[in-house]
Amino acid sequence: MPVLAKAALQQALEQRSGWTVVDGQISKTYGLATFPFAIEFVRRIADAAEEVNHHPDIDIRYNKVTIALSTHDEKGITEKDFGLADTIDRIFAAAQ
């Protein structure tokens, strides 16, 4: 899966709320009600990531979970990252 060109990357970001590029990865921070909710959210992300064999970087700070995605094999951002980003957004929406 090829790395997205700058224009395609910008277009993909514009179609998604809250995702930005940070240090060569797409990133988003989610706010959960409590620490246990944050941990459950991460558990669900882990299940989804395992299903597609694509694993995000995850940072947990109390009730805030930051996700960062890039395709390591391609050394950049690909459609695979946006596919998992969309899945994570759906997991978050279902948890609300």
Swiss-Prot record:
Instruction: Kindly give the CDD domains that the UniProt entry links to this protein.
Output: PCD_DCoH
The transmembrane residues are none
Report if keyword Lyase is assigned: yes
- State the UniProt keywords alphabetically: Lyase
Task: Quote the EC number.
Answer: 4.2.1.96
Any GO molecular function: 4-alpha-hydroxytetrahydrobiopterin dehydratase activity
The reply to whether Lyase figures as a keyword in the UniProt entry is yes
| Reactions the enzyme catalyzes | (4aS,6R)-4a-hydroxy-L-erythro-5,6,7,8-tetrahydrobiopterin = (6R)-L-erythro-6,7-dihydrobiopterin + H2O
A Pfam family (short name) is: Pterin_4a
Q: Which family does it belong to?
A: Belongs to the pterin-4-alpha-carbinolamine dehydratase family.
Protein name, UniProt field: Putative pterin-4-alpha-carbinolamine dehydratase
